[in-house]
Amino acid sequence: NLILADKTWEEAKELLTKRYTRAIKRTKQAKSEDVFQTAMNAFARTIEAHTSYLSPRNAERFQMDMNLSFEGIGAVLQSEDDYTVIKSVVPGGPADESGAIKPEDKIVGVAQDDEEFVDVIGWRLDEVVELIKGPKGSTVRLQVEKGATDAKTTSVVSLTRDKIKLEDRAAKSEVYVPETGPHAGEPLGVITIPSFYNNLSMDVAKEIESLKAQNVKGVIVDLRGNGGGSLTEATLLTGLFIEKGPVVQIRYGQSKVSVNRDTDGEVAYDGPLTVLVDRYSASASEIFAAAMQDYNRALIVGEQTFGKGTVQQHRGLGKIYDLYDNPLGSVQFTIAKFYRIDGGSTQHKGVIPDILYPSAVEPAEWGESQAENALPWDSINRANYTTFADGTAALDVLTAKHNKRILQDPEFSYIQDDIKEYKENKDKNFISLVKSVREGEKKEAEEKSLARANERLQRLGMETVTTLDDLPEDMEELDPFLDEAANITFDMIETGRYAITRN
């Protein structure tokens, strides 16, 4: 691959040597904590697919992901050779506010307040991060080698740690307005939810109010790639779109079943709603999508979801009065299975959208069903709930319009071609080592990409290019799946179905 990327033999040799050297170094830097976690998880996964042990550092990272916050300087770090490099800074964080730290700067030393500097060249990234993070209000000093110049000038930057909110991982909304077509100029709201973190429902409620103030005609909730998170937040999120009622059923052991309900009697948004999912939408995402589908409250579009229908509990191994200097980490273990309010389980089967998109991901090849020791699918009794207006008749109309539209859409034509090519190649168990053959394959792929790019440019009324390197830097990446979700939502609005009207 390096030779195909126009590297000389000497350059390829040097680069591979560096890669292998770094890999060996990382292996040698492994600690007993890493080995213990690996051994414990090898045992835990023989019990059940989602039972695991988290080392102290990974347990801390789990809490950070759930709370979308941490205490530190607000910088994203990455290891490059023996250096810890600043890749980006969090807007509004101490690193950003200082004005003294920029992307590509290298951290070569770390000191706590007035203590001596510790040289961190060659250290593991997580160990450097451990030194830099600390309680809000405390001081950390960094020796920084500027990355933007050839001269190796080192400066000392003193920063006061603060609580950092990971805004880039929080729910966001935008107004989607088609520029062409029968609905040109008509606004839809799109709420993108990356995960079910703590207080997600509060964030989404704010985004809904913002979209309503902009008079959107409908809302799309984008759950693509959302692997789940808090079960409580899945219930609260569902409650934003229904007045009250059961959201998910949970069975502990062999018999006890509890029902998580929305009880506030309030609705944040009562208009047309579409939920966009893919094969990587899992767990809490499936709870929300399934509830919306069972209530006939929203139209579900996209790919069949992952199929994770189990509930895990996260518990620290330390006790409140423990006197250990070092934390012990935590365990996650499966305590229950959750079920749709119609009684079915999402385990293995996931949520099957009302309108399925073409997909290269085969459910039999990726998902919960591929996990070793995954619990089986089963079902329980239906919960007591009332559906919204029956949308079956409207669904036939929407599906017909969708199928007709994607047959005429160049982007979906490309997607179908890619799926066909993937299926033809996925079972090949050989690859040519003949340079001329590989170069021919590369040229063919580049020509196909260039032809597609020029077709898109023409469609957008822009000038074509002669090479892929000449593509405009500000050219927006197309999202045909979201575009089609918008088209389906407009179709749904025209039918007058899937709004909140009781039978």
Q: Each predicted region: which residue ranges?
A:
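Short acidic, Pro/Gly- and aromatic-enriched capping/linker segments at domain boundaries
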Residues: 325-337
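Cleft-lining beta-strand/loop regions that shape enzyme active-site pockets
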Residues: 28-32, 54-70, 79, 85-90, ...
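Conserved functional hotspot residues or short segments at active or partner-binding sites
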Residues: 9-18, 340-502
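Acidic, S/T/G-rich, low-cysteine, solvent-exposed domains in lumenal/extracellular/periplasmic regions
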Residues: 291, 312-316, 327-329, 351, ...
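Extended, domain-scale alpha-helical bundle/helix-rich regions
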Residues: 1-72, 76-81
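Short, mixed charged/polar active-site loops
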Residues: 151-156, 328-330, 345
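Amphipathic, well-packed alpha-helical segments that form the structural scaffold of globular domains
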Residues: 17-21, 40-44, 48, 108-111, ...
